[in-house]
């Protein structure tokens, strides 16, 4: 399987790394295009794959084309590809760009729209995806193999859920990192060395996520398991709730969702 990845940024690189790790394609069968010579040099050295600045050269002979560029650059890219596709599977990972927006400009319908996230860099990604209705079972299987190589994948028959997933899992790592940063700073504030605070926070986050995944309990129930009457945790939770953490998170996710929708409307 020959794969062209158009865009060698963080997510484009994560896809290439995942494909190689899962041995879905050999190094000689992957081409990455990127406008920045510095990125091409890095990717060529790091993964021993072919690189080019020419999108059309990259897609020549490809079985799968991954569109991993910024949403604002899509009009130019789709214009370059229009009329040049015959049987390739196209996978777009651009936020907010709808299937109809891609298919209509390409006049081509073997298209998957996906929203991975940055933990894909370490094989722990969460990718939401949908596809054009007439996509064959074979192409669907290829899409699943590539997306699952990055971690977990979730298919949605209704495309409206992709913008919602963008606001949760696509942008979500940034929310988590902000929370982690704040907890580390809090640890330093009360006297912990930063490296110790960092370890405590990271392991707490990882352990909490793992216990929720394995025990399959509602987060409120798990929270109550930590909270003793009159204890330290209840005082901390009172401050978080009084400060509006819950409503801030809801409003933040809603803002990201609205932004994702607006990108598709442009």
Q: Where would I find each of the regions flagged by the language model?
A:
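Small-residue helix-packing motif on alpha-helices
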Residues: 30, 58, 193-200, 222, ...
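Short pre-catalytic strand/loop immediately N-terminal to key active-site residues, enriched for Gly-Thr
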Residues: 111, 162-167, 219-224
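NAD(P)-dependent Rossmann-like dehydrogenase/reductase catalytic/cofactor-binding core
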Residues: 202-266
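NAD(P)+-binding Rossmann beta1-loop-alpha1 motif at the extreme N-terminus of oxidoreductases
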Residues: 1-46, 50-53, 60, 105, ...
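Rossmann-like NAD(P)(H) cofactor-binding subdomain of soluble oxidoreductases
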Residues: 37, 46-47, 55-60, 64-129, ...
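Internal alpha-helical scaffold of NAD(P)-dependent oxidoreductase catalytic cores
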Residues: 105-110, 126-164, 177-214
């Amino acid at each position: 399987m020959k794969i062209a990845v158009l865009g060698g940024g963080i997510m484009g690189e994560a896809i290439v790394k995942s494909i190689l790790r899962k041995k879905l394609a050999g190094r000689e069968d992957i081409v990455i295009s990127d406008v920045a010579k510095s990125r091409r040099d890095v990717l060529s050295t790091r993964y021993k794959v072919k690189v080019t600045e020419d999108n059309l050269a990259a897609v020549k002979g490809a079985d799968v084309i991954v569109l991993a560029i910024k949403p604002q650059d899509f009009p130019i890219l789709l214009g370059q590809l229009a009329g040049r596709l015959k049987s390739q599977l196209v996978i777009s990972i651009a936020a907010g760009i709808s299937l109809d927006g891609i298919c209509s400009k390409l006049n081509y319908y073997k298209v998957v729209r996906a929203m991975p996230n940055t933990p894909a860099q370490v094989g722990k990604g969460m990718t939401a995806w949908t596809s054009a209705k007439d996509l064959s079972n074979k192409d669907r299987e290829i899409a699943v193999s590539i997306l699952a190589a990055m971690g977990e994948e979730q298919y949605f028959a209704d495309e409206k859920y992709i913008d919602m997933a963008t606001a949760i899992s696509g942008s979500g790592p940034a929310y988590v990192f902000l929370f982690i940063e704040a907890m580390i700073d809090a640890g330093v504030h009360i006297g912990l060395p930063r490296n110790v605070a960092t370890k405590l926070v990271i392991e707490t986050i990882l352990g909490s996520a793992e216990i929720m995944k394995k025990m399959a309990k509602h987060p409120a129930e798990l929270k109550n398991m930590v909270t003793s009457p009159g204890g330290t945790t209840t005082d901390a939770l009172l401050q978080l709730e009084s400060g509006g953490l819950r409503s801030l998170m809801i409003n933040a996710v809603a803002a990201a969702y609205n932004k994702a929708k607006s990108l598709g409307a442009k």
